[in-house]
Amino acid sequence: MPKIHELASVLADQIAAGEVVERPASVVKELVENAIDAHSTQIDITVEEAGLQRIVVVDDGDGIADEDSEMAFKRHATSKITDRRDLFRIKSLGFRGEALPSIASVADVTLITSTGGVGTEIHNVGGIIQEHKAAEARKGTTVIVKELFGNVPARLKYLKSPATELARITDIVNRLALSYPTVAFSLVHNGRELTRTTGRGDLQQVIAGIYGVQSARKMVAISGQNPDFRVSGYVSLPELTRASRQYISLLLNGRYIHNFQLSKALIAGYGSKLMVGRYPLAVLDIQMDPLLVDVNVHPTKQEVRISQEAELTQLIQETVFKRLSQENLIPDVFDEVQTKQPETKTTDQLTMALNDVSAKYDMSDRQVLGAQQMPSESVAQPSDAAPVATSMGQPAPLQTPEEVPVEPVVVHDKRDFATPAVQRFDAKYRQEQVAAPLGQSAASAAVDQPAVEATAPIEPVQATPAQRFPTLRYLGQVHGTYLLAEADDGLYLVDQHAAQERVNYEFYRQAIGEVSDDEQKLLVPIVLDYPTTDVLELTNHLETLASVGIHLDSFGPNSFIVHEHPTWFKAGQETATIQEMIDWVLKDGKISVAAFREKTAIMMSCKRAIKANHHLDDQQARALLQKLATAENPFNCPHGRPVLVHFTDQDLEKLFKRIQDPHHSGDDWEEA
């Protein structure tokens, strides 16, 4: 008797279901995607007991003809592709023909469908059709799934708690709603409505319905394109962040995908505007020719392979960076407080006005780019779019300008570099600090007026209009840590450490952030030992390391020797710096000298910035504000913390009860 035999179709379906149907959320995803492919405009999802007891998906799509209804339950039966060439131009969400038979093999499934005439009802249990009959039904399809995994109870023990499984279902529906704002979605669990969208095509209104109105108001529209890709959507301002990447939705030709490199590019677009360990909210819609993407990678179709991915990541990073550069990134104090308050979602969120950047998301123009139809003219897009400073000890009080020449308001440490080239630039920096306090450049110091006496009138600090930075008038210092200033639109509180850190960072980034060929010969070479696997990997990247000044020569089977290093390496830390860059290569397979030097600039800017409890005189404080106003990004320190916060006039009036509370009766209100 032969040992190799063909599996029964029902058993084969159950095996395939292990990849397609992992949990109740997988069932919801597959059924809703089928409804979208059927051109539905209204999709209603009802689940009971987190989907384990019952899942119902109702749509108003094209429906299934009676003659095709049984075929829909067969493996690899689909209407979405016909031949091999279609695999390279997939425009639908589904195409493998596995979803319905996989679901039916592990559940009790009822299909009710109609194309507009007499409907059809099919009852399938465990992959076997039990009944096929005519039924009264409106145009569209209803799929009822009961007793999921009832015939494979071993699968149940791998599921999480009902709350976790329900959260996964909600997440899937929310992602699909963000992908298709022209489709009205509703999700109901045990009689309680969890999600509802209007299907009006306004992406920002969908964001408001999912994440809340306050979050939607802090998101801005982005748009960018190149010959192969078109990017649009919404990203949050740096003040609105979350603790994980899960609030980043990447949509590729209408399909929600997971792609670490694209998420990384989006985050890189924020630069130093994000705090460490914080991530933005974003909905990024990417349109491209289907020829440039392979979605036939995994049965869930959430992992894809993208051709020319490097060009796409660059486009995303540049688009986000340019858009955020146009925004005023000063957080409002009361907005920060309000976002921490519990927010009760109501259906009013779906229709209320958000702000001027709210725009209709024209899905009629959201076409998949074809090889012969690349973007050339118009592009469908959304239109119009205090940290607690750690005390480092009480420093000696600063002397006044009348006693001695103004000293730089920096922490004077020992020389950080030992090489002559860097000593020259470091000396130049210190001279500029003496001539222009708190990092003022020689160019700006040359055009400034003579030093202001302590008794002179306080002049407004002129800001750069392009940065939308306010014109600040210095008022005083609070606890040797914060500078108080006023502007025409209210009161500003400036973190002096973060402010000088930003000023120093931009100086160092320009001074040492450019690649140089200067190298320092070592009297005693550095020997580095690595495992054989790392040595073999490093041999593939010797040219890359050499391009940034790290020349590794073989020194035995498991060692390298280094005879020289770039002059900008910090004295005493040459070995650690080289090892860090080598580890970077081993981890990522590539290295960016510009990014590494930027990290160095961030480190030095923090070390040389004034700390908390460091009292400044009026001249030094005004000099710091003046320099901050000319910074490229005056709103955040290099680590992403805010440099200043804003109290509007209305905020101040609320604090002193000069504005009537809308919930307070006005009969006994006294107007000041």
UniProtKB/Swiss-Prot annotation:
Q: Which InterPro entries match?
A: DNA_mismatch_repair_CS (IPR014762), DNA_mismatch_repair_MutL (IPR020667), DNA_mismatch_S5_2-like (IPR013507), HATPase_C_sf (IPR036890), MutL/Mlh/PMS (IPR002099), MutL/Mlh/Pms-like (IPR038973), MutL_C (IPR014790), MutL_C_dimsub (IPR042120)
GO process annotations (BP): mismatch repair
> Cellular component GO terms, alphabetically?
mismatch repair complex
Q: Where is this region: Disordered?
A: 371-403
> SUPFAM superfamilies given for it?
ATPase domain of HSP90 chaperone/DNA topoisomerase II/histidine kinase (SSF55874), DNA mismatch repair protein MutL (SSF118116), Ribosomal protein S5 domain 2-like (SSF54211)
Q: Which CDD domains match?
A: HATPase_MutL-MLH-PMS-like, MutL_Trans
One Pfam family here: HATPase_c_3
Q: Which GO terms describe its molecular function?
A: ATP binding; ATP hydrolysis activity; ATP-dependent DNA damage sensor activity; mismatched DNA binding
The UniProt entry, under NCBIfam families, shows: mutl, PRK00095.1-3
Q: Which family does it belong to?
A: Belongs to the DNA mismatch repair MutL/HexB family.
Known role = This protein is involved in the repair of mismatches in DNA. It is required for dam-dependent methyl-directed DNA mismatch repair. May act as a 'molecular matchmaker', a protein that promotes the formation of a stable complex between two or more DNA-binding proteins in an ATP-dependent manner without itself being part of a final effector complex.
Identify the PANTHER family for this entry.
Answer: DNA MISMATCH REPAIR PROTEIN MLH, PMS, MUTL (PTHR10073), DNA MISMATCH REPAIR PROTEIN MLH1 (PTHR10073:SF12)
Extract the HAMAP family matched here: DNA_mis_repair
Q: What protein name is recorded for this chain?
A: DNA mismatch repair protein MutL
Question: Which organism's genome codes for this protein?
Answer: Levilactobacillus brevis (strain ATCC 367 / BCRC 12310 / CIP 105137 / JCM 1170 / LMG 11437 / NCIMB 947 / NCTC 947) (Lactobacillus brevis)
